Amino acid sequence: MNPDEYDLTDSDHQKAIWDLMMQPITVMDVGQTEHVYPTFTPGADKKPYEQNCAGELHGQSQGVHVLEEDTDGDGYVLIEAYANDGTKTDNEYMESRNAKKVQGYVKKSILFEVKPSDKYALLVDKLRQKLYIFEAGAIIGELDVSTGLNNAKQPYNESPAGEYITVSKVGDFNAGSGTIGRFAIRINGGTLLHEVLHDTAKDGTRIYTQYEAQLGMKASHGCIRIQRRANAQGQNMQWLWNNLENKTKVLIWDDQGRQMYEPELPDGGLQLYRNPKGGSNYHVDANCPGVKEKYLPLTGDFTYGDLEKDEFKKLTPCSACGAPVRPETLYERYVFEANQIGAEVTDEVKAKFGIE
C-alpha cells in the first residue's frame, strides 16, 4: 500500500486501512527471537552472506508476502519482507539492507497464517512519528513515538516497515546503565513497543526529560518508543499494555519515497503558564503535576505565540503536562525528516515558521 494515498482524517480511508489490517498475516514458525535468512537461490547456504543472503527476518511476528509458490516441488517459496538490523557478514553488518524490502527463498514448511485480533490494531507512521490506535474501523487515538535512528557507529538502527503482530509481553526493557523502557511488547524479534525511556535516580525517581524531548522524531535503536503521558482519550503506552490482545496487528509505514506532510503549528493563542520566580519551563496546565505545590497555581501571562519574545526565549516545554515544543524545534524536526527521505523544504513551509 502507498501511505500517501490515504488521508487519516477521512473515515472511509480509516475503514479501508482497518480492513487491510484485519487480513491474515503469514509468519515463520521459528522462535520469536530466532532469525530466518532468505537466500537468493532455493536451498542455498546463507554464507557467504554478501553473495547468498537476502537479509535477516524474525519468526512468529514478522509478516512476509509469498511472491512465488513452490511450483517445482523443491519445498521453497519466494517471499518478500523488510530486512532487520542484524544481518551480518563474517566481519560487519550489512547495513545497506537494514529496513530495505528484500526478496529471497525460504522453506515453505516454516510458513503459517495467523488471524489477527479484531479488538484493536496499530498503525505507526515513520514519516510523522505517530502511532494511531484503530478500533472497529476507525482511529480512536494517536500517540507520539520515536522510531529507529541510524548513527555513525550503528548504521543499522532503522525500524523496518511492514506488518507485524504482537507476540509477547516483555515488561521492563533494560537499555543499559539504568535506562528502562516500561511495558515492552514484542513485535519483531528484538524490536519492541515500549514506553519512552527513563533514567533512574538513586532514590528510584524516573527521569524522562532527555527521552521525552525526542518524541516526534527518530531516536531509538530500532524499538518504537511511545509516550507515557496520557492523551485526551486516556491512552498511552500503559494503556496499550493493558488493552492490547496477543496477535494485535501492527502496521508500520515507511518514510522513504513519501511526500512531506504539511507541518502543523500549535495555535498562537494557546494559553501558557510559568513560574515567574525562576521556573525554567512553560506549561499548558496552571496546576501542572510536575511542579511543586507551593508554586501553584502558575501564572498565565503569555501564549504560545509569545515564545519568541525576549522574556520567554529561554523557557523550555514541560513534559509533565505535555506542553508543545517550541516552533524552532518543530522546524528542526521537519527539516531532519525531510533530509532523511531526500525531500525539499518548500518556501511555503519556511514562511510558516518565519524562516527567511
Predicted segments, located by residue:
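SH3-family beta-barrel domains
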Residues: 1-45, 57, 263-279, 344-346
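Intrinsically disordered, low-complexity Ser/Thr-rich linker and spacer segments
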Residues: 90-95, 109-119, 264, 328-334, ...
